Amino acid sequence: MSSKVEQLRAQLNERILVLDGGMGTMIQSYRLNEADFRGERFADWPCDLKGNNDLLVLSKPEVIAAIHNAYFEAGADIIETNTFNSTTIAMADYQMESLSAEINFAAAKLARACADEWTARTPEKPRYVAGVLGPTNRTASISPDVNDPAFRNITFDGLVAAYRESTKALVEGGADLILIETVFDTLNAKAAVFAVKTEFEALGVELPIMISGTITDASGRTLSGQTTEAFYNSLRHAEALTFGLNCALGPDELRQYVQELSRIAECYVTAHPNAGLPNAFGEYDLDADTMAKQIREWAQAGFLNIVGGCCGTTPQHIAAMSRAVEGLAPRKLPEIPVACRLSGLEPLNIGEDSLFVNVGERTNVTGSAKFKRLIKEEKYSEALDVARQQVENGAQIIDINMDEGMLDAEAAMVRFLNLIAGEPDIARVPIMIDSSKWDVIEKGLKCIQGKGIVNSISMKEGVDAFIHHAKLLRRYGAAVVVMAFDEQGQADTRARKIEICRRAYKILTEEVGFPPEDIIFDPNIFAVATGIEEHNNYAQDFIGACEDIKRELPHALISGGVSNVSFSFRGNDPVREAIHAVFLYYAIRNGMDMGIVNAGQLAIYDDLPAELRDAVEDVILNRRDDGTERLLELAEKYRGSKTDDTANAQQAEWRSWEVNKRLEYSLVKGITEFIEQDTEEARQQATRPIEVIEGPLMDGMNVVGDLFGEGKMFLPQVVKSARVMKQAVAYLEPFIEASKEQGKTNGKMVIATVKGDVHDIGKNIVGVVLQCNNYEIVDLGVMVPAEKILRTAKEVNADLIGLSGLITPSLDEMVNVAKEMERQGFTIPLLIGGATTSKAHTAVKIEQNYSGPTVYVQNASRTVGVVAALLSDTQRDDFVARTRKEYETVRIQHGRKKPRTPPVTLEAARDNDFAFDWQAYTPPVAHRLGVQEVEASIETLRNYIDWTPFFMTWSLAGKYPRILEDEVVGVEAQRLFKDANDMLDKLSAEKTLNPRGVVGLFPANRVGDDIEIYRDETRTHVINVSHHLRQQTEKTGFANYCLADFVAPKLSGKADYIGAFAVTGGLEEDALADAFEAQHDDYNKIMVKALADRLAEAFAEYLHERVRKVYWGYAPNENLSNEELIRENYQGIRPAPGYPACPEHTEKATIWELLEVEKHTGMKLTESFAMWPGASVSGWYFSHPDSKYYAVAQIQRDQVEDYARRKGMSVTEVERWLAPNLGYDAD
């Protein structure tokens, strides 16, 4: 270890060190242009170079040096080289692969010079350089082609070559450490570790390695799907100096994952979060002092050894952090229990206290005839089902073997492992790569991002080959199965087994440096009851060897192929299962940790028939000389039988319960099949029909409510429960009506979507959740005027009123309802909810207009608690007082709140518009001008569906497809996803929901902040004008955008175009939902609305693709996956009126006039410019390659007056439509 490394370790033990902040953020502040990036050397480079930040170490080194020095001056101990994208792979985007080594070397040398200068100034505070290896722009474990999940656009070897070249240059340029950062695909990082270790060996150096991963969203997983602990387990073999997290999230969101890492990591922990989450402009708003306060709390909690900043952070942030952690003790390295720490997408830790681990054996061509056939016939989809079944049946690891004479084992292994990577329900468990061919093993290791197991290596080919393979496995980061096999052959006796294992253990731990907990011995399981006397003690020898290994070889694990022991009884599954059960019973007691088994065919030792168990024990323990003969005689009795014939009986057992328990079970499980039958039975037993509702049905719903409140049931399950409840109540209603009885409820609530708004999915869900908790709901539907809401509330004597809305004009209508409630003397609570609502708006705009309780409810899951408190005699006063005090604080803070960035005049904003050389650009000519009706089938659109918002509708948080394997909601998400696809199948087959739309392309040019739209190419007749708003806050280093900027100015003489569209998931949406409601089926009512919404968004995506490739035709060769479409990785944008880039809703009327939308599609606009049906999307098309989404945000009075003049509206009217965007008080 060098003196510098020793010095660094000493510093880490004494204090929290500080890393630098965002490099890209600082480069942007210089507002460099294309010429700056090129410099003299690259003036004639054949492609654009602006944005190639890493190139600046050659073309503008003074800028990068200034940024390094600014961070050192701010207090940074470590700076990162400007090489995030300097691999040959990433540099290919700029045709600069050949410059990779030069850029890395120059970057390290430049950072080294800055660090040495600052160390010379303050020798007591040495400065260090971390040579950065970025993630590249490729993913080794994710297919870029949605139609071919086995395809990869980069290989492990390709990554290793690129990372080796960069590492060599960074080391030679003077880096003190190598930082592998922003890891979103762990397989890329494993390749980086392999490359760094290999290059260190070639150079004869050993620098500390830092690793930092990226948790991409609230799911708590990397982009490639791993949890924090799985990610750590996968890279633990790097023996990194530090392990940490950076990017994607701000301190609030990242905290829990840093906390988890600090608990599990044996090394030092780093964190460099973003300055919060990006705002609508893609900028970061978290100021330095606020961020530093959060970081100080982390440090005080003992999470940190090194801290810095990522996107959006500046020297001001780093200076504040440096002050915040000064004097605080660094995190102490924890003592972590020794365990074999494996991973798939999720961790699997096998320690001393772990239960037996099942390794699924059926994905093995040598052991499963079915699997072999599927692989040979290339039926990989069915082969995946075999793997999935093993996991579903309890396999915690799956063993994969492709060794078959007529197979290309390498190709089959690679393809199957790549396919598994795209199946989260399989990939969540670790992989055991099983082969007798080293080349196959290596190919497999290059495909798995988790920490897997290699099965196997041995000393049969000599010690040199054994050591060579073991060293490579260590570098790949795999645990290893070591066979009890040496130059003399397989160990068959207990003495030979421990002799070979002892020798292998010594070589691995002392010569190779292999962690003992990653060594898994297979002392050879051989078949018993073969009729050969020498074989009689095979099982007992294995069991005894387990005891020897555990006693003599600390932390080593034991495994074996369990099916081998029963091979003599192949064809007699019940006897084989009994042999396995008895064998495992004794082997596990003696230390066996895991076994390769058929996870779906494991019998339970205590459940075996006594005579069979005793006979098997005689054989396994070799207790009788005639044990084999006796078992053979008995075996025929059990051939073809099943030891667990009770499965079907258990499944139907609940039908034998007493009726009240059956009703509860049906409610909790959402089973409608028997509900009328059981409800009638309960009615026959009750004195009055109402007692069935107030008794067993409400008891069951109380269980549902409790489970939902405790997080043990999820919204889709609750809605299914409500469906059962409604059908039971509907059955009882005629009997109740005949007896003139009314049930007792917890309260009555009128709910409605306000006038002008047609969106009701969220409202419907709230209604269902409250009904499940015995509240009576009077649902008035959508577009309900204030007068009707209040009249109904009086008529039904409501206890509460709930208002919902999605579009921004609904906010004003909610204020109007509150004013009317006050005027009419209401005192009952008013609840506010919906996508555009907020606590701030409720406090500032609504509550002050109504003296009764006014409460903002964020989501359905919180509604029950709020309603219960408001109607409680004991809780109400306190809850209302606390809420009013909270809202008063919100109003005070709102009044004091200053804009994050100061406003500028409209004139100044226009002077800072999007600067573009229109003379050097020719806009693409639209191929098909005019208006066209468009239809698309559900089967076409389902390929374009973004499912993540669908799950959000049902309050299931997580990103698709990873949500399907989520530890908490995964099972329910899978059920919901199946139900959704079943309904799509039905809607498609029956054609009961028919998406339709209209699109138009028109000649157009910009005039100021407006876009003139022309009748034809003569451009002499203006048929309409699209009016737009400009960003009006100070934008240092950025333009003040307006959508009109992306269309060629009229004065430029360039012919440009604009597109418009309107699509709906189907006019039949409401009728279908009403039909389900009539059947008391809230679940399918909400489902059809949610799917119609998804189909509308999918239609918009599909139509935009058609416009780019065909109608406008500026991207005819575009070939994007659905994920890439969702991420909008294409040229052009389709902003929608009412959304951040064009927030004013009345502009939809321009689209309706241009396209004659109602005539072509039947879609309508309400008085508030909401679209009907609710599942509808409309917007504009822009083709400009630099067009982008942004948020207009707050505008000032001068722009409002200008906009009113341009639109021919009064200022007051414009202020009403743009109320959320006003940067001044309009009252």
Swiss-Prot record:
Domain B12-binding N-terminal, residue spans: 650-744
Enzyme class, first EC level, given as a word: transferase
EC code(s) of this entry: 2.1.1.13
Keywords in alphabetical order: Amino-acid biosynthesis, Cobalamin, Cobalt, Metal-binding, Methionine biosynthesis, Methyltransferase, Repeat, S-adenosyl-L-methionine, Transferase, Zinc
Entry binding sites for methylcob(III)alamin: 694, 756-760, 804, 808, 860
Catalytic reactions on record: (6S)-5-methyl-5,6,7,8-tetrahydrofolate + L-homocysteine = (6S)-5,6,7,8-tetrahydrofolate + L-methionine
Gene3D superfamilies listed in its UniProt record: Cobalamin-binding domain, Cobalamin-dependent Methionine Synthase, domain 2, Dihydropteroate synthase-like, Homocysteine-binding-like domain, Methionine synthase domain, Vitamin B12-dependent methionine synthase, activation domain
The Hcy-binding domain, residue ranges: 2-325
Bound cofactor: record note: Binds 1 zinc ion per subunit.
Domain AdoMet activation, first and last residues per copy: 897-1227
Effect of residue 757 to N: Decreases activity by about 45%
Alphabetized InterPro entries for the sequence: Cbl-bd_cap, Cobalamin-bd, Cobalamin-bd_sf, Dihydropteroate_synth-like_sf, HCY_dom, HCY_dom_sf, Met_Synthase/Corrinoid, Met_synthase_B12-bd
UniProt pathway: Amino-acid biosynthesis; L-methionine biosynthesis via de novo pathway; L-methionine from L-homocysteine (MetH route): step 1/1
Record's GO cellular component terms: cytoplasm; cytosol
Biological role stated in the UniProt entry: Catalyzes the transfer of a methyl group from methyl-cobalamin to homocysteine, yielding enzyme-bound cob(I)alamin and methionine. Subsequently, remethylates the cofactor using methyltetrahydrofolate.
UniProt record similarity statement: Belongs to the vitamin-B12 dependent methionine synthase family.
UniProt miscellaneous comment: L-homocysteine is bound via the zinc atom.
The name this protein goes by in its record: Methionine synthase
Annotated organism of origin: Escherichia coli (strain K12)
Phylogenetic classification of the source organism: Bacteria, Pseudomonadati, Pseudomonadota, Gammaproteobacteria, Enterobacterales
